[in-house]
């Protein structure tokens, strides 16, 4: 597996007044989640040789994630100031410079995943697009929209960047909030149809407490969310996306374009992802489950 995108440190301000720091970033969380689930993962990212960079490196190494490029493309490791509300939901303010040094192409990945800011924030996003264009076809491309309006906005230029990446993806995941922010003129079903029209074989939408849906040429499959006590929502979507990829890999469905998948398998894949995300939200910070916790 190859994951491409941002690493950062979440500086978390809790409703109680407590301040804590966790290594993370959408793409870093996906890489760590995949590695904890037992998948060999290489990660193309950027972080600096500073205190926060050391936190990121330790986070990746502890899970067994290997770097696919020299991360020293930036002078200061990115941070996200996350404020946690009483309901556990997080809002963010970012300090982020995104650049990417040359990425090792070997060993050839069966899947390439990109997401969030790394897929749309210049100048690094151009390198991500080049990489996806080169590897798609031989590798399954998965894309988690994970919009961050606080840093990118939701104007036509941002929507165009998201759509440019979606055109290269076999599977696109987005939350209902992502779809509403980027395409406010469309209802949820219309936004899903729009993404599928761009070329994605599958569009997965997570809807918080209302569960998740998988839409393809075969129709729509919906599963319920898992009820847990929420510590916070940091890393929940990242974990869900990683577990989707893990479940597809477990069934030998990665490597090239996604073909038709039966509803029974889709339910298993979505429930696996929901179970992983439920574990993550049950504990503070982006702390995805290990394989043994998924039993």
Could you tell me what each predicted segment is?
Residues 1-15:
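Positively charged, low-complexity intrinsically disordered leader regions
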Residues 104-106, 164-165, 196:
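Structural alpha-helical scaffold elements that stabilize or flank donor/cofactor-binding regions
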Residues 11, 39-121, 141:
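Conserved N-terminal subdomain of the carbohydrate kinase-like
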Residues 134, 184-295:
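Conserved phosphate-binding/catalytic region of the ribokinase-like
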Residues 31-40, 247-249:
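Alpha-helix C-terminal capping segments
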């Amino acid at each position: 597996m190859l994951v491409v995108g941002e690493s950062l440190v979440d500086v978390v301000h809790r409703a109680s007044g407590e301040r804590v720091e966790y290594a993370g970033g959408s793409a870093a969380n996906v890489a760590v989640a995949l590695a904890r689930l037992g998948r060999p993962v290489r990660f193309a990212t950027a972080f600096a040789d500073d205190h926060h960079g050391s936190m990121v490196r330790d986070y990746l190494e502890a899970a067994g994630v290997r770097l696919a490029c020299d991360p020293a493309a930036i002078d200061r490791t990115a941070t996200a100031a996350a404020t946690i509300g009483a309901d556990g939901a997080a809002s963010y303010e970012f300090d982020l410079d995104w650049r990417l040094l040359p990425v090792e192409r070997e060993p050839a990945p069966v899947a390439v995943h990109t997401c969030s800011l790394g897929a749309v924030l210049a100048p690094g996003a151009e390198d991500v697009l080049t990489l996806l264009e080169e590897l798609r076809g031989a590798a399954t491309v998965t894309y988690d929209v994970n919009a961050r309006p606080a840093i990118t906005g939701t104007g036509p230029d941002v929507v165009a960047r998201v759509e440019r990446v979606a055109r290269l993806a076999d599977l696109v995941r987005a939350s209902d909030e992502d779809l509403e922010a980027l395409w406010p003129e469309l209802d949820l079903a219309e936004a899903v149809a729009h993404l599928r029209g761009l070329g994605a074989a599958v569009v997965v939408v997570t809807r918080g407490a209302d569960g998740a849906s998988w839409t393809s040429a075969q129709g729509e499959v919906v599963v319920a969310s898992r009820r847990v006590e929420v510590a916070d929502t940091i890393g929940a979507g990242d974990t869900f996306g990683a577990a989707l990829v893990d479940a597809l890999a477990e069934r030998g469905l990665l490597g090239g374009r996604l073909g038709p998948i039966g509803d029974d398998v889709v339910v298993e894949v979505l429930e696996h992802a929901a179970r992983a995300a439920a574990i993550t939200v049950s504990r503070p910070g982006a702390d995805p489950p290990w394989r043994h916790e998924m039993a």
